[in-house]
Regions:
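N-terminal Sec-pathway targeting helices
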Residues: 1-10
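Hydrophobic membrane-insertion alpha-helices, especially the h-region
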Residues: 9-17
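Active-/binding-site microenvironments in catalytic and ligand-binding cores
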Residues: 5, 17-231
Length: 231
């Protein structure tokens, strides 16, 4: 019931934000202009993709440290947030990670990352652009951000989540996994269409699938539908 209520609420919020400022003679340069569906499904262009058909998944803190939030326990206010996009340059090395220097350079160009943001990490190697269907079949990799950079974002910018285009494996860096869980951060893996997003100014809405009540407190991963409202 909680997840269903949240989905109804986010659709309502979506409608308000998109249409509230569209009044005759009203200048609203900062309003949201369109929505980008970042969900990865079997048919990327499908307009009626259900959450349960989504290949995009949320990894809750409980998947990283047992006893922390499961997917159905993440507070709703942490599922709607400002969205920033940081490019990961893979031209030099396949195992590139976002570094503290990358974060500093991003903020020099775009301004300080808003508190409470979700950080999307976009692959920027021209030779490996991922389509919506490709990202689900890509190799599983570490979260593409250095441990100290992630810790800075969580502690100094109070980020609440990270979104990536590939599957994520935390087995090689349990320290980072622990940091994420202790800060209440979740990860959205196998997302799509990051190339359609600006670096800043968007709003992300994450809607987990409805989980059976008996498993509500145990499921630490779940399919999600994610939308970005773009200015």
């Amino acid at each position: 019931m909680r997840i269903r209520s949240f989905i109804i609420a986010y659709v309502f919020i979506l409608a308000i934000l998109l249409f509230a400022d569209r009044r005759p003679g009203h200048a609203a340069p900062d309003r949201y202009s369109h929505v980008v569906d970042l969900t990865n499904g079997q048919i990327p262009s499908a307009q009626h993709l259900s959450v349960t058909e989504s290949q995009t998944r949320i990894i809750a803190p409980g998947a990283l440290i047992p006893g922390t939030w499961a997917a159905g326990q993440i507070p709703p206010e942490r599922l709607i947030a400002p969205l920033v996009v940081v490019d990961l340059n893979l031209a030099a090395a396949e195992n590139s990670q976002i570094s503290l220097d990358d974060i500093a350079a991003w903020e020099t160009q775009h301004g300080m990352i808003p508190q409470g943001s979700v950080v999307a990490i976009r692959r920027s190697n021209p030779s490996s652009n991922l389509s919506a269907s490709d990202s689900a079949t890509q190799y599983t990799s570490d979260l593409p951000i250095a441990r100290d950079a992630a810790q800075f974002l969580m502690e100094a910018r109070y980020t609440i989540a990270f979104a990536v285009e590939t599957p994520v494996d935390f087995s090689s860096d349990r320290t980072l996994a622990r940091q994420l869980a202790l800060h209440g951060n979740y990860v959205v893996e196998k997302s799509a269409r990051f190339t359609a997003l600006p670096a800043t100014g968007s709003l992300i809405i994450v809607a987990p699938a409805k989980i059976a009540p008996a498993k509500d407190k145990k499921a630490v991963e779940a399919p999600v539908r994610i939308l970005a409202m773009v200015r």
